[in-house]
Amino acid sequence: VTPEKMEKGIYKKFSFFKDQVEVSPKTNKMILPISIKETSSKTIYRKSPKSEKTIIEGVNSSGIEEFFNTGDMLGTILTDVFSDVNIYDDDIRLLQRRFVSPIGRGAISFYKYYLMDTVMVDRQECVHLTFVPQNSQDFGFTGHLYVVKDSTYAVKKCTMNLPKKTGVNFVDNLDIVQQFEQMPDGNWVLTDDDMTVELQFVKGIQGLEVQRTTKYSNYNFEDIEPRLFRLKGNVIKEANMLNKSDEYWASVRQVPLTKKESNMDVFMNRIEQIPGFKYVIFGAKALIENFVETGSKKHPSKFDFG
């Protein structure tokens, strides 16, 4: 959203759109939050025999997705595009492409590194390095590494950026910030994993900024009950995951919602009151879902088309 756009179109006609605009903490650009999804989960891992399962304890969402039957529409799209990033892998699979990790085995021949300074990161002395692809035409990251200045040479923090010139479809910019902490037993673990992507699907049409913030905590290396690994599937969804209270989310939420994110339900209710909005959603449903409801929440229909 630009200051010019704030003075025309829907922002001028419906002032509550302008009231919903905020400054992104990730890019410092003005944005209009339209969707938010929170997931609280627990991951268990066994080395031998190898097994890993994720138990989803709570899911909370609000925003534009509520108007579609496929309520996880945006989440499904993003899951298909994004994947977890492990900088300790030799290659990073992201945006349906493969990138050389800045600390992978092939990194030295792919990237150029520059020693910048010695800095403090969370009270730990670190060596600050920057890196760029050896060949500016190569498909790779630019970024910063903060390496602990001791015998471990562990990565304390890593930031990676995918420049627009890289040529990934629809992606104007992508930023990844990861931070690590050392456990009492000496192991280093990932604690913060933030990804921000700016998408532009059609030139001249308002783009999207998507933020994925992941926090890891409560690491425990004690033995896990064997029965948990006998649960079927790699992802287990608790029966009441969609019915968690506000008190539950207040207790597990590690990043507080912004004022505008907290106001999402009110904002969506006001959008529903806009004349003609239901026809826009009707057309969008037909296009996106290939399915059209003939009823409403208050008056469900026995017949749908799809």
Predicted segments with their positions:
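Surface-exposed, low-complexity/disordered segments
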Residues: 1-111, 122-124, 184-306
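Extended beta-strand-rich segments in extracellular/periplasmic secretory proteins, especially
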Residues: 92-148, 152-159
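Amphipathic hydrophobic-ligand
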Residues: 110, 137-143, 169-177, 208-211
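Transmembrane beta-strand segments that form the barrel wall of outer-membrane beta-barrel proteins
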Residues: 131, 159-164, 299-306
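Beta-turn initiation residues at beta-strand->coil junctions
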Residues: 133, 159-162, 194-199
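A broad structural signal for short, well-ordered beta-strand segments within beta-sheet-rich domains
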Residues: 140, 155, 171, 188-192, ...
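Extended lipid/amphipathic-ligand handling interfaces
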Residues: 143-149, 175-185
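Beta-strand-rich interaction surfaces with strong enrichment in secreted/lumenal proteins
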Residues: 165-166, 179
